[in-house]
């Protein structure tokens, strides 16, 4: 029973992810910031979809943070610094099928506070 519930939950997230990705894409001047969260950590990438390259990436394991709101704020500050060093101050936020709530919302707000326009 539990395995079926988890499969359904993950498959619904992947459906949401595909609907979102059909509508957004990243350019060199305005990359797509994709977030992935696990139970232990958060992973973030700034992706330029035209050439299919990752401009910069950061994750909670390297920074030694947990997958909570305060950890998301630290991660946002790190990725905003990397983007600013490349001269990028605008991006498209890809929530990757997750609800815009909790850690995902805290990450997006912290990005805005650190000077990245979403």
From Swiss-Prot:
Biological processes annotated in GO: translation
CDD domains in UniProt: Ribosomal_L18_L5e
Record's keyword annotation contains Cell membrane: no
Top-rank taxon: Bacteria
Alphabetical UniProt keywords: Ribonucleoprotein, Ribosomal protein, RNA-binding, rRNA-binding
GO MF, one annotated term: 5S rRNA binding
Entries under SUPFAM superfamilies matching the protein: Translational machinery components
GO CC, any one term: cytosolic large ribosomal subunit
Pfam families, per the entry: Ribosomal_L18p (PF00861)
Keyword Transmembrane helix in annotation: no
Family: Belongs to the universal ribosomal protein uL18 family.
Record-linked HAMAP family: Ribosomal_uL18_B
Subunit (UniProt): Part of the 50S ribosomal subunit; part of the 5S rRNA/L5/L18/L25 subcomplex. Contacts the 5S and 23S rRNAs.
Job of this protein: This is one of the proteins that bind and probably mediate the attachment of the 5S RNA into the large ribosomal subunit, where it forms part of the central protuberance.
Protein name as catalogued: Large ribosomal subunit protein uL18
Organism whose genome encodes this protein: Campylobacter fetus subsp. fetus (strain 82-40)
Name of the gene encoding the protein in the UniProt record: rplR
